[in-house]
């Protein structure tokens, strides 16, 4: 009889990571539990049974086995296309399933109060708010050594470095993800990781979805979109899946 799954304790293996990050990210590094306490957000840590790596709408049809652990996955989308919302869905699914995760938030986009409906298990989240791309990459490299199941690097909307030096940097992060069996998701406005990314997902936003008819007030409920798998193992041609991104209730 197989042993019951015992989720790792929240952020139990992070002391060394926190020590490495405390200097360069002083005042901009928080555990989710601290964050929730400051914002008055309810803390929950109840595992869910659903596989967390297929949390994005439509992802299960594109990647039936889920996002690959130990690899670098790119999620690209322009401004206001739902990229950060998708990142929150992944973080919520992973932490609610009993996994530990980190968000390297270069755009400083996380608002704990508005993100609460996403269902993130805050005690299992490490949140870093670097101010520059160099800091964000260093924080990502450190987080990959922390025994986490998921690291999300959201690059916001800054100009991003390119060239051979950048390619070597992404390859190094991909190697670290593989070595530590961590899923590294790089969310950016456009492709940055080049050949280091084993899987590439592109998110495009369609029309806005409104509630209300006739003379009733119209309320924005979300947006239609399309998730396209443009690179993946044994992928012969891009595959797309329609999705709907709902605003938190």
Language model region names:
Residues 152-183, 190:
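Conserved P-loop NTPase nucleotide-binding/switch module
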Residues 89, 97-164:
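Conserved inter-motif catalytic segment of the P-loop NTP-binding fold
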Residues 78, 106, 155, 188-189:
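Fold-independent oxyanion-binding glycine-rich loops
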Residues 174-249:
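Phosphate-binding/switch region of NTP-binding enzymes
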Residues 65-67, 93-96, 118-120, 142-146, ...:
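Conserved catalytic network of the ASCE P-loop NTPase/AAA+ motor domain
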Residues 1-103, 248-249:
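Detector for small/aliphatic-rich hydrophobic stretches
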Residues 56, 69, 84, 130-137, ...:
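Amphipathic alpha-helical transducer elements in NTP-driven molecular machines
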Residues 73-75, 102-104, 126-128, 185, ...:
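Hydrophobic/aromatic beta-strand patches that form the interior of the parallel beta-sheet core
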């Amino acid at each position: 009889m197989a042993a019951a799954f015992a989720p790792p304790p929240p952020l139990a293996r992070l002391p060394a990571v926190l020590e490495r990050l405390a200097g360069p990210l002083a005042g901009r590094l928080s555990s989710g539990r601290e964050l929730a306490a400051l914002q008055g957000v309810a803390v929950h840590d109840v595992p869910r049974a659903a596989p967390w790596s297929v949390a994005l709408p439509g992802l299960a049809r594109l990647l039936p086995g889920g996002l690959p652990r130990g690899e670098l996955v790119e999620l690209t989308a322009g401004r206001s296309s739902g990229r950060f919302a998708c990142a929150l869905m992944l973080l919520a699914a992973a932490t609610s399933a009993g996994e530990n995760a980190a968000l390297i938030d270069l755009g400083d986009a996380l608002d704990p109060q508005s993100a609460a409906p996403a269902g993130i298990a805050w005690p299992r989240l490490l949140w870093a708010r670097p101010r520059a791309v160099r800091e964000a990459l260093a924080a990502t490299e450190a987080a990959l050594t922390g025994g986490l199941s998921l690291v999300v690097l959201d690059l916001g909307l800054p100009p991003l470095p390119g060239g051979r030096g950048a390619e070597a940097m992404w390859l190094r992060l991909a190697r670290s993800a593989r070595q530590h069996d961590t899923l590294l998701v790089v969310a950016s406005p456009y492709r940055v990781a080049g050949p280091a990314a084993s899987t590439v997902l592109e998110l495009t936003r369609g029309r806005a979805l409104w509630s209300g008819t006739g003379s009733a007030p119209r309320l924005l409920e979300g947006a239609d979109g399309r998730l396209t798998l443009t690179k993946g193992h044994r992928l012969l041609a891009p595959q797309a899946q329609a999705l709907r991104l709902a605003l938190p209730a």
